[in-house]
Amino acid sequence: MDVIIIIFIVSAAAAAFYLYLVFPTRVSKEQREIFANRCYAHRALYDNKTDRPENSLPAFEAAMRAGYGCELDVQFTKDKKLIVFHDNDFLRSSGVDKKVWELTYDEIKQIKLFESSESVPLFSEVLSTINGREPLIVEIKAEQLTNEWYSELCDATLQMLRGYRGDFCVESFHPVVVRWFKKNAPDVVRGQLVNARRSSPNIDPIIVFPVEQLITGFLTRPHYIAYKEQDRNLALRIVQKLGAMSVMWTVRTQERQNELCKAEDAIIFESYTPAPFFNKHG
C-alpha cells in the first residue's frame, strides 16, 4: 500500500511539474476572435514566377484584396534597418551569396527578387501597404543570436508595431525572442514556432527537443503554438487543452486544410487560394 501511495505522489508531482513547464498564456475571447478561424498567406499571396514574388509589396496588396491575413518575416540588415525577407541569404531569391546581415539596406534594395522588378521592402513599407486591413503574423528572424542583436531587433520591431494601427501577433523559433516579448510587451499576442526533430535533422536534438515538446513554455508562456503541419504531437494537444491557440504551417492543398481545420485555430497556406475564413468544427 505504501508503495502505491508513493507511486501516486511521485506521478502527481511529475504531472504537476510538466504542466508548470508547458502551461501557456490563455488566449482571451477577444484575441481568439481576431486571429482564429483564418487563413494566413505565407509570405503574402505570391507567385515567384511573376512580378508578385514572396514578401513583396505587390504580394501583400494581393493578399489584402483577397481578404487574407498574412504571415511575414522580419530581420535586421547590417545597418539595422527592418526588412521583410525570409532567408538568411539571397542565394535562393536572387543568386547573391551574401547574408542579410552582411549588407546595408541601400545595397539590398539593388537586389531584385526572383528575376522580377521587385526588391526587398522595408517593414514600414509593408505596414503602410497593409494599413490595418487584415491581421498579421510577424515572425522575427534572430539568426544573429547575440544578446545585443536580438534585443535591438525585438525592440525595433515592437516600436514599429506600436505605431501601427492594425491587428498583429509575433512569433519566433527562438525561445529567447518569445521570452523578450513576454517580459517587455506582455500584452502582445506571442507564439512559439516549432520544428520537430524529424524536420530538423541538421540541428542538435538537444536544442530541438525542449522546443518540440514545449517545455520551454515556463520561460515564454506563449499564447499560441505554430507547428509544421506534419509534426502535430501530444504536447501540442495538451497545450491546446490548456488554452493556447494552434497555428499550422505551411498547408499547400485545400484537401489538407480540410483535414487540419477541424483541430487547428489558424492555417498558414501557400500554393492555393482558400476562402479567407473557415469553420473549425466542420
Question: What annotation goes with each model-predicted range?
Answer:
Residues 1-282:
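Phosphate-group recognition and catalysis centered on beta-loop-alpha active-site segments
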